Amino acid sequence: MVSRLIAVVLSAGACCSATAQALVDQTRQQTPPTRPLTLEERGDILMARKMYREAIDTFQSDKNKNAVLYNKIGIAYHQLQQLDNAKKFYEQAVKLKRDYAEALNNIGTVYYAKKSYRRAIGYYRRALRISDSASIYSNLGTAYFARKQYIEATKAYQEALDRDPDVFEHRSNYGTLLQDRNVEERARFHYELAKMYAQKGRNELALQYVRKCLEEGFKDKKKLAEDPEFQSLRETDEFKQLMATEQRVL
């Protein structure tokens, strides 16, 4: 994570970005493609190139619209910050496929962006009844975190980490960044992340987030000194050095 702000992830469906990248690569080859690209595939290429308005026009011109296509149109509008349009197309997707976890998750991200965190939580939980997804659990945790429900947030983040040990390290499809969180709240998030990694024995990452939370002015160093999750870390030179360092707020 670069600055490691908390993020909400949009869902396009399994392997969508990989497929789009493969199509982009195909267009760069010297030999012509074995078959003409469909409108949906052309739209996927435009999405991969961040040409969202052009992607919308291309998807819209496809007469064979299905739930996946409506979800993709919603994502394109979402990337353009046209949240109401995005929500309309996500809802169209759910009408066609009521168990469409990705579209339900994305409706949740719209409500999250509008700071309607309770509704976002409701949609994330609906999505999780269908799909046991690490990224949706992470989104759920972020929504709880925004409501300062830290116990529930930590539980959801733990569920995400259990399903994907690197969920917080390789998330590339960012949606709405939680930029309205203050430094104190970011410090709390990084403390919780450090604790989860320490509990799983991933000491290098745990130390990284201990450092981050202290740099952001985490006020309760006593927790770091006493929480049982950090017991193995407390014997390391790196941890001792971090604890001896004077706190400074970035």
Range-by-range predicted roles:
Residues 2-37, 48:
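Long, contiguous interaction/recruitment modules in multidomain scaffold/adaptor proteins
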Residues 34-82, 109:
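Alpha-helical segment of the N-proximal tetratricopeptide repeat
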Residues 21-36, 180, 184-187, 197, ...:
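Terminal, low-structured helical/coil segments at or just beyond the last alpha-helical repeat
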Residues 33, 64, 98, 131-132, ...:
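Short coil turns that delineate tetratricopeptide repeat
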Residues 47, 71, 75-78, 95, ...:
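Position-specific recognition of the canonical hydrophobic site in helix A of tetratricopeptide repeat
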Residues 48-57, 79-92, 114-126, 131, ...:
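Structural signature of tandem alpha-helical TPR/SEL1-like repeats
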Residues 41, 72-75, 106, 139, ...:
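Canonical tetratricopeptide repeat
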